[in-house]
Amino acid sequence: MIITTTENIHGYEIVEILGIVMGNIVQSKHLGKDIAAAFKTLAGGEIKAYTEMMTEARNKAIERMIDEAEKIGADAVVNVRFSSSSVMSGAAEMLAYGTAVKIKKSNE
């Protein structure tokens, strides 16, 4: 499965557009880590607990998007985008979405 943020895949031709696919997850951090993160905001700098949470959420959202694409027989997902939103304090939704397509090697 090829996943790309671009419209096209070098060396391939899109032969069929199957439609939009997406994967999402709502994830939260442990209360203790949330408290530690609150103190970190006072001092400034990276809040590693939240960086890790968002990385994990993004990866899970990609996995779920790929699962959805595979279910409809896609070879690739193009124009992949991400969106995140706060659902509640300490919890965020990560959404990965793109266009599922069938591809073939081009004759270039």
From Swiss-Prot:
<dbReference type="InterPro" id="IPR035439">
    <property type="entry name" value="UPF0145_dom_sf"/>
</dbReference>
<dbReference type="InterPro" id="IPR002765">
    <property type="entry name" value="UPF0145_YbjQ-like"/>
</dbReference>
<protein>
    <recommendedName>
        <fullName>UPF0145 protein THA_1434</fullName>
    </recommendedName>
</protein>
<dbReference type="Pfam" id="PF01906">
    <property type="entry name" value="YbjQ_1"/>
</dbReference>
<comment type="similarity">
    <text>Belongs to the UPF0145 family.</text>
</comment>
